[in-house]
Swiss-Prot record:
The lineage of its organism: Eukaryota, Fungi, Dikarya, Ascomycota, Taphrinomycotina. Component of the npc107-120 complex which consists of nup85, nup107, nup120, nup131, nup132 and seh1. Interacts with nup107. One of its GO terms (biological process) is transcription-dependent tethering of RNA polymerase II gene DNA at nuclear periphery. InterPro entries: Nucleoporin_Nup133/Nup155_N, Nup133-like, WD40/YVTN_repeat-like_dom_sf. This is Nucleoporin nup131. Belongs to the nucleoporin Nup133 family. Functions as a component of the nuclear pore complex (NPC). NPC components, collectively referred to as nucleoporins (NUPs), can play the role of both NPC structural components and of docking or interaction partners for transiently associated nuclear transport factors. Active directional transport is assured by both, a Phe-Gly (FG) repeat affinity gradient for these transport factors across the NPC and a transport cofactor concentration gradient across the nuclear envelope. One of its GO terms (molecular function) is structural constituent of nuclear pore. Keywords: Nucleus, Transport. It is found in: Nucleus. It comes from Schizosaccharomyces pombe (strain 972 / ATCC 24843). One of its GO terms (cellular component) is cytosol.
Amino acid sequence: MFIVHRRFFQNEKAFTPAGKHEKVADGNKHETLATSEYPKVCASNDLYKILQISAPKVGNFTIHDAPVVGLIDSILEYYLYISVKVRKAWIAGYGSQPQNLICFDWERFTGILDQQSLNSPPLAGFVKPDPTSAEPGFLLLWPASGDLFYWERTSLMNVEVSAPEFPGFLHYRIQLKRYESCKNLVSAEPAGFFLTLSSGRLLHLNLKDSDGNSSIQVRILFPGLHIPNCLLSLYNSIFAFTSGRVIPIRCGSIKGPGERLVYSMHSGSTLRIWEIFGTGDHHLLRGFDIYDIILDSIQESFSYVNRFLILDFSVSTSDPYTLACLVSWRDNASLFNYAAIIISFNHQMIPHVSQFCHVRSYLSAILPSVCRIFLPSPGTVVFCVFDVTFAMFHKVRGKEGTFYVEENLVVNNLTSKSRVLDFGMEDAIYEKSTHTLLKTPALILLTEGHGIIRIESSASYLKTSFSATTYLRSRLSQFASQSPLFREQFLLNFDFTYNLSESEVYNTVFNLCDELYTTPCKKNMSVLETLHSQQRDLMEIVLVAFKYLHLSPSNRLQLWLKVAYCSALADLYELLMCNEKMSNLLRRVLKIMSSNDNIDELFLKKCLNINLLLQHLSSEYSQISGQDASNAQKRIEVIVNVNNVYGTIFGNELAYRQEKISKFTDPSSVIRSDLWTVEVDHLDLLRKQIEDSISLHRDVRDSKDAHILKVSNKLRKQILHLVEQNCLLIFDLHNGTDDTIVKSHNFQKFEEEFGNSRKEWLQYLASVGYLEKAIDLAEKVKDFQTMVILLDCLDPKDPTIKLQKQKACLNKYKEEFADVIFFYLVDTEQYASLLHDFLEYQSLLISFFEANDLLNLLWIFEAQNGNYGRASEILFRDCEPEENRIIGKISQLALAKLYSWTNRIEGENIILSNETEVIENHLAILLIQEQYAEMLSSLVDITEDEGEAVEAIVTSNCVNLSENSIRAWLVSSAVERLIQNEYTTLCEMVDFFSSFSLRECSFKEVDLALELLERATITKDVYFYLKDLVYRRFLLQVNWAEIIDAHEDLESSFFPMVKEIMLESDFLIWLQHMEHNIHDESKHYLKSEKNFLQSVYSSLSESQVEDYQMELFREKQIFSVLCKDRELYILIPKLLDVATKQ
């Protein structure tokens, strides 16, 4: 990950941003990234540039070979990959071609190296060549065995050898103690190499003898501690833990041929400076302890610190009098803090701290495994490395002097392709062969999948004054110019400006935008090309700012509208250049607005007053329309041109308010811009322009002139766009939480008037072919009242389209849309649609009915959904006493009777009938409702007469009701008293109990009915007649197919019922009696039955008696067929026998 943080240090004081200056770097200057040439620029800003200086793979080497070790020599510009897995090493120079790749396989030394060495990575180093040779030599050292291989030239590594040595190749085995191993191999070329051992010994390796010939000579520079061999293993483990954190050897300036300064750190803080010669000689120049001076420097800023660690130090090859130390200490939260300490030496070589740079961008709970510091050029830049995090300190010049800016770079180590294998440093002064070159100080990274990456410090920041504007501009330019390789290798942190206030960040970006779109016209570029170029640059900087900066919603909108203004100017200028008729009108207006008739200056200097332009255009059209009222062709041409300008201006404003800004923030949470203030007067101008356009379009849309019709069609499209812009812009302004225009009285009054205008506009759009667009626009601005009206205009042949849109809005807007659509259906008496089409929105419908006291619709809705109890409570809400239980039951039965009756009309559900019948059927329902209400209201006065109440219930004959509670309540003492009444009631009681006997599959219901009849004060003939009727109806209702199957299956659920019926002796006797009379269809039987019926039902007319007689006769015929088909006379004795045995 690559993170950039911004830090300013100047005597530990806060940095105050300066004014705006300097131009933004061109984001297109890195187009060479697409080429195959190296180096490739990955990203850049004012402080540094990041480049890829070698190919990601060389020759046949690929990332799949899993290198685990890397080495880079930034002086000789060579690098090395080592893979233990395949026991190979790949060597290449920065600019090497694939054919020059050197691949070395160390398995050829299996006779020399033991198995442990073959399976472990070697230490390596490049050797500085002779002045006459550009090709370096190479060292490989196996730490455990001490075997050292030296090739005078890297090209010799491909030579197959059979002998231990051959010309140009040397093998030497360093004498190691038991349990001793090699730890670090440090290049001090041209003065040889330094080798640190796990025992603490420091060796100097010289690769030439006194005559200049190749020879390996080893001298002990520091004997280390005298540790017995028995304790050396324990010491090795301790040293291994610390050696990765403290590198004790650093090589400094090259003094001459074969001479170099070397710095070593002993005992944690004792610095020794050596003069080393290629002949193997050495001389100690100075030695001193730097602990106290560093502690004093830390305590100036952090007084609580009393101890610290020196993790690493670095010296520059160009300046022997300056070194940098990376130190660490714990704070009160037990976190490790880090700082870069710059130490300088005076002419007497006495050290003092010249700069303290606290690393504010990195804290850690534990010390990282890799801690490095690099000082490539004193007084310009310092690099610090913490595992995968790099902290860079750049020295810059501000108004109050020089100070350091800290930036934080983090390597993206999520993939193996981005892993960093080694670090190198490139000094400002670079010696190559016999030449001394001046180079840019840089940090070099050897990556696993992207080759060599160079972080190059820039010197430009020391030439000009550095400020917050400069810094922000360079960062935004850097982000905009990132290459794909940079994004893969690094990640960027957006929070690099967290120590600046929001207003400072926004003001700086706003100033950058001003600089961008007021840049002067370049040579050979037209005004229009300049405007489009400025628009692109402005868009780029705003998009990058939105991505990486923390800006408030209002600041985001202000930046967007700055782009909108620039975009509108570009579009207006294009209209001015490309449309001759438009040009005449627009030029005339623009010349009035320009003091020196220089129209281009209005656009280039961004001083065109949009509000004034709209007023002038409105006045121009009014004047022309008044002068040539009868000239329809001229009026329509002028209004089309004026509409083009209105559409360009308001369209750009709206586009950046509504569309593009929605990607970054909620438009309802932003406020308007002060760039060009949208006042009520200007909205009113737009409204007047729309009304004038609609009025003119009405006059000319039926014209027979072909040209006028063509322009009229264009005007129709313009009306659509202008209405859309006006509606959406006002909707956006209305939702601005902090917008002063919304809070003004004028805007509120305007919005009320606009609501009526909007309805008329949308309906006009629907009438001229834009019905669907008008519906969508009404939905966008949440004008649901107009929307439901427009939905009714959809194709009536396919009502599903309208219903789908209505349901989609109900799902999206819930109650907000439900109240509008339901009220509309009620007002237009679309009851069938209201009660049938929206059944899945039951909760919304019920809430709507209840809230608006629409009980006449609510009880029907509940009833058709089967909620009879709830529906009855609603239907009789006004006439039901709370404590009257009888009236409650009556109301339930009455509702059931009513609902059953309405469903039997011609087999249709009255509530679901088509629209032509709904009014008539609704009146019928209300009539029945009034009748039952009158009946129940009369019962209120006689609630103490329980008999009359029960009689009313039974008279209602609600045989379709099956509640157990109602049935049990009917079989009560009240029902017994009912038996004393007319015979008509008794027949209805038989019907009632027969229906329940079927549902309950129980003969108890029949038995109960017969018991009540027997207790009644009726003649014996009447009793036997009714008993015969009860038995026969029961047998007709029993599912005999189930009973026939059950007589052999004793576990069947029907068997208890069969047993119960068969054990009834009266039933068997009656069945045998019926066997003799079942086929009696003679006129004598009919005549006797008729006489009997006339005696029982004396109140019936003769025709009514005959009808009832024929109904009973058909019932007997059905019973006869049933007995024959099912062989009941054979089956019943069998069942009786089975039941008796059981």
